[in-house]
């Protein structure tokens, strides 16, 4: 069903899920639920339909946290740093694998519920902000100014550009402790992407 599928820890983590295509849409949510390579869930079904309706013949669902959980409040308050880093690098890898990256930001209000959501967002953005990336949101923003989660959408809506830099600086109140160190931000995105892609295409991965 889905030829893009990366999971870990006996499927307790899902890094990426999607379908290959000539025109790819990357989606960044909060955390994965029950969808697998052989079975979609409600979120994946909506995401795939929105992608097709808007001219994308492929998509990949990524998340700020890779831990599977059906309710966000059941996620741990803290997460292993290496799990976070591996997930962040995979997000970067998939985004940069597209010649003209388009990224649908789709986390909703829940991004404020765990610090590691914000840490992951900052890491990914700061690492690749010099790249030409089309950051998008679908439909109206939430009352608090967050890009809306796919569980609450109208297929008649459309994509609009999203100023992710301003969002991080002002919409999200970001304590200093959440910001990556200067050493972390020195990661070369092309190098990270090459290392992760070595020997295989990012959009043709089933494990």
Question: What role is predicted for each listed range?
Answer:
Residues 75-189, 203-206:
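Glycine/proline-rich loop-helix segments at beta-alpha junctions forming the active-site rim
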Residues 57-75:
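Short connector loops at secondary-structure junctions
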Residues 187, 196-199:
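Short polybasic linear motifs
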Residues 1-41, 53, 207:
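Active-site and ligand/interface coordination hotspots across diverse enzymes
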Residues 44-52:
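Short catalytic helix/loop segments, enriched in acidic residues and glycine
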Residues 24, 57-58, 102, 134:
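Residues at the starts of beta-strands that form the adenosine-phosphate
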Residues 34, 68, 111:
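Feature marks short, surface-exposed loop/turn motifs that line or immediately flank catalytic pockets
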């Amino acid at each position: 069903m889905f030829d893009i599928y990366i999971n870990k820890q006996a499927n307790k983590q899902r890094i990426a899920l999607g379908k290959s295509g000539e025109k790819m849409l990357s989606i960044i949510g909060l955390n994965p639920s029950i969808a697998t390579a052989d079975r979609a869930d409600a979120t994946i079904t909506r995401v795939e339909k929105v992608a097709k309706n808007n001219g994308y013949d492929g998509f990949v669902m990524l998340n700020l946290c890779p831990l599977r959980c059906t309710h966000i409040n059941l996620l741990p308050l803290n997460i292993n740093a290496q799990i976070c880093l591996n997930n962040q690098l995979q997000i970067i890898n998939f985004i940069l694998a597209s010649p003209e990256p388009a990224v649908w930001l789709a986390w909703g209000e829940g991004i404020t519920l765990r610090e590691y959501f914000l840490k992951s967002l900052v890491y990914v953005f700061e690492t690749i902000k010099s790249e030409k990336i089309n950051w998008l949101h679908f439909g109206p923003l939430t009352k608090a100014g967050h890009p809306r989660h796919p569980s609450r959408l109208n297929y008649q809506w459309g994509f609009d550009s999203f100023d992710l830099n301003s969002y991080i600086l002002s919409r999200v109140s970001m304590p200093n402790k959440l910001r990556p160190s200067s050493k972390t931000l020195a990661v070369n995105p092309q190098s990270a992407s090459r290392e992760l892609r070595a020997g295989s295409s990012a959009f043709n991965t089933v494990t």
